Amino acid sequence: MPNRVIIFDTTLRDGEQALAASLSVKEKLQIALALERLGVDVMEVGFPVSSPGDFNSVQTIAKTIKNSRVCALARALPADIDAAAQALAVAEQFRIHTFISTSTIHVESKLKRSFDDVLAMAVNAVKYARRFTDDVEFSCEDAGRTPIDNLCRMVEAAITAGARTINIPDTVGYTIPSEFSTIIETLFNRVPNIDQAIISVHCHDDLGLSVANSIGAIEKGARQVECTVNGIGERAGNCSLEEIAMILATRKDKLGLETGIVAKEIHRTSNLVSQLCNMPVQANKAIVGSNAFSHSSGIHQDGMLKAKNTYEIMTPESIGLHRNNLNMTSRSGRHVIKHRMEEMGYHTDDFDIDSLYEQFLKLADKKGQVFDYDLEAIVFMATQVAEDDHYRLQHLSVHSDSSEGVATATVRIKVEGEDLTEAAIGNGPVDAAYKAIARASGREVEISSYKLSAKGQGQDALGQVDITAKYQGRTFHGVGLATDVVEASAQALVHVMNLICRADKVADIKSQIQFNREHAGV
């Protein structure tokens, strides 16, 4: 049995299902490139038949990624498999991942078929997918609640049909480690052709057991783990990639297994996914949480000073989180900032040093010392602005009357090269700023959620504002970042306005395509 575990990342497919708003193609490509640097073996990047947008993003990523195998999901239906194959055809190497439900409750209540019918559909789907590639993966959806006799039959039939990877999902996170590992062990004992396929597991975290179940399965012979960065995913999330990777690295003495993960890329990738997906990592999250390497107990601190391994089973540096003893202030030169970005794992083509240094100096003048998370926040926001350039917030000033709770805001916004200035009165500074921006843009939106979080520590920390807004029946998510809360709030709304503008352009293009189709040959 091989001593290497294949890491199958599904951040861009299963992970994206947890997001309030879908990622853009550019954002998905950023994450895909980060996953490639991280060293994932396979990345599942979408469900092409689900929408033209998903098809386009899968195709774009498939064209770009060279060192990881790109995979797309398809139900056990010819149309789904056709869409996946067409989107992936541009890739140097690709996998089609097809699936069907196998548990009694799914077969009877959702599919309304007999198990034998479902078995035949699975076999036909695998055979059909093999027309396009030798790398076909088959998943038994809700395997954790599937009668073991049926599961053994399904796995044997799928392997015979040509599946080279068989995935056993705990779709609803129901099993406990002893149960799940027994399922894997039983498959190895009872399926006669099991040696002709890699056994994979895909565990959800509804009971907080996804990582434990995956490790239990590995101990019984599974050699692929499906996971996501930061454990994001539907409901309570998926098995966490960084936890699986570091368990296997840290406990190689016990498990004797390895992966192809470049551990020093973990922190950087986690931060990128958190920022782009607007899903903050909880402070006590294993491996990548802000407290993961913090020691506040006096006894622990004393031990750490004497020998770090008294209370650290891995180092921050091992995941790319460097302890920085260099203070970055307005007196720091451009080369210092460039060097620090490279120390944090960024490549020179990930950021524009001139733009970064300009924003760094502005921030340093405001808050004195600038920290790593400040630099990363500036880089992240630069990607947002670069993508959404229809509206630009040029100036914002606010005056508040604390006695009456009334505020006046004046904004200057650049709209496709033209400066527009508007003022408004509101119930507080944020409300006033929003009304002024609405006037300048000519769009009235409904704010359905508003969230403020600190990016750093202390009173001079950067503030991130995340809003969800509704406009003409559609939902948009915006983010803004600044040392001033009102400015961050204004930037978040401008971000929403740009997303609306982009959506309108896409709708116009779709309408034109539809018109051309309807009038072709007329």
UniProtKB/Swiss-Prot annotation:
Signal peptide: none annotated. It catalyses: 3-methyl-2-oxobutanoate + acetyl-CoA + H2O = (2S)-2-isopropylmalate + CoA + H(+). It is an enzyme of class 2 (transferase). It is found in: Cytoplasm. InterPro entries: 2-IPM_HCS-like (IPR050073), 2-isopropylmalate_synth_dimer (IPR013709), AIPM/Hcit_synth_CS (IPR002034), Aldolase_TIM (IPR013785), LeuA/HCS_post-cat (IPR054691), LeuA_allosteric_dom_sf (IPR036230), LeuA_bact_synth (IPR005671), PYR_CT (IPR000891). Pathway: Amino-acid biosynthesis; L-leucine biosynthesis; L-leucine from 3-methyl-2-oxobutanoate: step 1/4. Its main location: cytoplasm. Mn(2+) binds at residues 14, 202, 204, 238. The keyword Metal-binding applies. It comes from the Bacteria. GO terms for biological process: L-leucine biosynthetic process. Homodimer. Belongs to the alpha-IPM synthase/homocitrate synthase family. LeuA type 1 subfamily. This is 2-isopropylmalate synthase. It comes from Shewanella denitrificans (strain OS217 / ATCC BAA-1090 / DSM 15013). The lineage of its organism: Bacteria, Pseudomonadati, Pseudomonadota, Gammaproteobacteria, Alteromonadales.
